């Protein structure tokens, strides 16, 4: 676009253009490539001037074939870096990226590429162990039927547990009645025992008092009416029944 619009020259450089570019850089130094075409009086773009200087006209550039040491270093660097020619040329002093690329494509690529291709083919041929595909069991949902089915309900119903299991050979009602009767009899016995104990205590006190009276009063003494102080035994036991005692 730049060459077509401004009529810039393209193609091979002449000796006159090389001398003008060399004089300009020696005078102003490297850099500011956008000003080089104007200062040198060249009808070239700045990119063309820069590449011409770095690849061909720079005084530190080495010309000729690469030495054996340089070829060995080029092979090792190419194994590490690949086709990064600018990085490889930076490690080969005096060699440009264009020179390194041209030398590789002309002398070394045909010797080393077949070996690389064979290695790549061997790598491709080696089978990769593959695990068999697992079968995914798909479970489809089944619609539920809400119709009443006696057979299904009978099968699916949970087992019934009897809260009050029947006793072996016994009737529950009879057992309950017997237990109630037993408790009533037991309460009656306790009540009678308590009454007897209380009556015995009362009787003991009564006998003690009667003995004291016998000591103080002789047995032969009688009342004014002639009655004795002795009590009837039947009247004494009638006290347990709650009846009143009448003295004769």
Swiss-Prot record:
Residues 33-57, 85-108 bind DNA. SMART domains: SANT. GO terms for molecular function: DNA binding; DNA-binding transcription factor activity. One of its GO terms (cellular component) is nucleus. Keywords: Activator, DNA-binding, Nucleus, Repeat, Transcription, Transcription regulation. GO terms for biological process: anthocyanin-containing compound biosynthetic process; jasmonic acid mediated signaling pathway; positive regulation of anthocyanin biosynthetic process; regulation of anthocyanin biosynthetic process; removal of superoxide radicals; response to auxin; response to ethylene; response to oomycetes. Residues 5-57, 58-112 form the HTH myb-type domain. Mostly expressed in mature plant aerial part. Detected ubiquitously, with higher levels in rosette leaves and flowers. Changing residue 167 to R: In strain: cv. C24. Its main location: nucleus. It is found in: Nucleus. This protein has reduced anthocyanins induction activity in cv C24 and cv cvi-1 backgrounds. This is Transcription factor MYB75. It comes from Arabidopsis thaliana (Mouse-ear cress). The gene is MYB75.
């Amino acid at each position: 676009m730049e060459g077509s619009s401004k009529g810039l020259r393209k193609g091979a450089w002449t000796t006159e253009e090389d001398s003008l570019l060399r004089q300009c850089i020696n005078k102003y130094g490297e850099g500011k490539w956008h000003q080089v075409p104007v200062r040198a009086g060249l009808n070239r773009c700045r990119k063309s001037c820069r590449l011409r200087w770095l690849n061909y006209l720079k005084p530190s550039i080495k010309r000729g074939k690469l030495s054996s040491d340089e070829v060995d270093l080029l092979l090792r660097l190419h194994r590490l870096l690949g086709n990064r020619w600018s990085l490889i040329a930076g490690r080969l002093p005096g060699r440009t990226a264009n020179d390194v690329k041209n030398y590789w494509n002309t002398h070394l690529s045909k010797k080393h590429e077949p070996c690389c291709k064979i290695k790549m083919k061997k790598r491709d041929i080696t089978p990769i162990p593959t695990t068999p595909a697992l079968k995914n069991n798909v479970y489809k949902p089944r619609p539920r039927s809400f119709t009443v089915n006696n057979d299904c309900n009978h099968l699916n119903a949970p087992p019934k547990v009897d809260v009050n299991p029947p006793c072996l050979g016994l009737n529950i009602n009879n057992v309950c009645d017997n237990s109630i009767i037993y408790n009533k009899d037991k309460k009656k016995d306790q009540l009678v025992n308590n009454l007897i104990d209380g009556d015995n205590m009362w009787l003991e006190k009564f006998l003690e008092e009667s003995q004291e009276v016998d000591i103080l009063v002789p047995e032969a003494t009688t009342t004014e009416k002639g009655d004795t102080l002795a009590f009837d035994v039947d009247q004494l036991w009638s006290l347990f029944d709650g009846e009143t005692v009448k003295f004769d």
